[in-house]
UniProtKB/Swiss-Prot annotation:
Protein known as: Sulfate adenylyltransferase
Keyword Transferase: yes
BP term (GO), one: sulfate assimilation
GO molecular function: ATP binding; sulfate adenylyltransferase (ATP) activity
Top-level enzyme category: transferase
EC number annotated for this UniProt entry: 2.7.7.4
Recorded superkingdom: Bacteria
SUPFAM superfamilies for the chain: Nucleotidylyl transferase, PUA domain-like
Annotated keywords: ATP-binding, Nucleotide-binding, Nucleotidyltransferase, Transferase
Gene from which this protein is expressed: sat
Amino acid sequence: MIKPVGSDELRPRFVYDPEQHHRLSSEAESLPSVIVSSQAAGNAVMLGAGYFSPLDGFMNLADALSSAQSMTLTDGRFFPVPLLCLLESADAIAGATRIALRDPNVEGNPVLAVMDVTAVEQVSDAQMALMTEQVYGTSDPKHPGVETFNSQGRTAISGPIQVLNFSYFQTDFPDTFRTAVEIRHEIQERGWQKIVAFQTRNPMHRAHEELCKMAMEAVEADGVVIHMLLGQLKPGDIPAPVRDAAIRTMAELYFPPNTVMVTGYGFDMLYAGPREAVLHAYFRQNMGATHFIIGRDHAGVGDYYGPFDAQTIFDDAVPTDVLAIEIFRADNTAYSKKLGRVVMMRDAPDHTPDDFIQLSGTRVREMLGQGEAPPPEFSRPEVAQILMDYYRSLPQS
């Protein structure tokens, strides 16, 4: 089985030992505490689940700046984005060396993790700008990732953490949320050797379904792990429970038995385009995937990134020896009226745009909101029905 990034064994930060978990939970209630941002909570979940292995906690400022500039920490370890825990104020934990991190997304703000504080540092505006430029390719405050990053405060607390729970992800999505540890175990149970991972933050239509099948066929994979983001997105995106239902329906009806796993992970989307694509590859290797699909404008938003920047970054900026996972580079896929099947558009040079069935996201939302199913060549009818029911449930503007 493919090894985790940077180590022979996965190093999740969740406290699995029941006695230790009980002791730590009791201790945490009496520790100085802070409510962290939603993004930091998601990162704590990812650390706990083993996705960010071998990192053991939140970065100090020097490591965060180094990661932003070179995708390596000051000790040379590879990690493609800064992992900061930013606060508006650290007054509540002043002088403390051990603190509790509380969850902003669960009622009552329960303790999510315990941190051994190694540094409390102020981040300057210039340092924030440097990180946003390097990671997001822009400092534009309208970029949703930049806006979120800049809204979290300027005090960075760092240090290793011990994670006590997986926030709302495990309770709200018990059939879908999986840790990297659990996915590795299931891959071994199934006897899969070659595994394709597919990232999605949206429902999957015919083009996505066929892309997974194309990738599996091309690399002779035993199965595909459809790995959906369960955390916060930008306003207007389809909520996770609806995406979950639509994707599960598609997988159950249209993939051969024992060739697909539908899973999810707890993380707030960065919309960091190429840098986020590298992070996605990083933690897909940690969960046991040997191949990862990266398509056009992967993890992008608006017009901030070129259509294939998320692919070329692996040639231009990622050292060849840090990731063992292989990238399956995809173009847009669409149904060809000429050929009667879904194809990658780059593989049909004799086609004109009119030869494909393509619908914009806006047009699809309009159709679904009006109770009109997209063509079956675009969307499976069972998937379309789930989405139509969701759009009809929304307040009419």
